[in-house]
Amino acid sequence: KQEVTQIPAALSVPEGENLVLNCSFTDSAIYNLQWFRQDPGKGLTSLLLIQSSQREQTSGRLNASLDKSSGRSTLYIAASQPGDSATYLCAVRSYNQFYFGTGTSLTVIP
């Protein structure tokens, strides 16, 4: 069974820092991996989608890497801003199902 783990569970950093959020999964048989953000009281917003054949994706200040063989994905956030404060979730698509991590709650302090 696929299990997805995210560390750290919570992170508080000063504005301007570069951040690293980690996601690990137990089964390398994945179709794709997706990073989302969730703002309080709102639904999920898709940030980056990495197909299993790809190594990374970039969008603005965000970069996500995927190492399927070691079961890891990393989300890098450059020059963090207070508006980046949210819960970040990693989801792996395996066996026609989505498996979500428990998320990392990020607070960026101005």
Q: Where are each of the predicted segments found?
A:
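Extracellular domains of the immunoglobulin superfamily
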Residues: 1-110
